[in-house]
Amino acid sequence: QQLDAGVDKDVWAATPQTVNAFYNPQANDITFPAAILQAPFYDKNADEAENLGAIGTIIGHEITHAFDTNGAGYDENGNYRNWWTEEDLAQFMARAQKVKDYYNGIEIENGLFQNGDQTVTENIADMGGMACVLEILGDDKQAQRKAFESNAKIWATNQIDQYRDYLLMVDVHSLNKVRVNAVLPLFDQFYDVYEITKNDAMYVAPEDRIQIW
């Protein structure tokens, strides 16, 4: 029915009962089905910082998809065309390569690594989502702590090794624990809140704390 009808930007990407969220570059919109607007992603009884660390980072994540290595190829009307200056595009791709390299270096266990090339768009979106939330929270360390810990809770996972290995092969997202343990150390606020030092396992040197947006 929709084959010759053109792009209908009012058609949803999922059913209301789907627990997920989406960015569609051809429509340049984000979709949040009703089912994701419940705990642990959104809780009406939680405070602002906790909700920002959960659903807030997801909202920021989906918006950032408009500016990842895929979404950046579409203009504001959903047309696939280059709208970047040559210099800006070169800078962006150089930073994206640093993201790939960073995640390629993450060892899950015993020589098993995250694939940074396969997951680059989602990793950029994860970083962008957290950056948005931290900008909103300002210098409030208590609020930052709540947001960090709320963010970690939404990615809590229990899975067998075989399923983990399958995800590493096919999923464009990093493993859930990587979405926490690799993202938070990229932000200076994480070090201030938890008093992280060079001796801690999650320490990343300041010059290696990649930021794109």
Name these PLM-found stretches:
Residues 1-54, 65-213:
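Zinc-dependent metallohydrolase catalytic domains
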Residues 58:
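P-loop NTPase nucleotide-binding module
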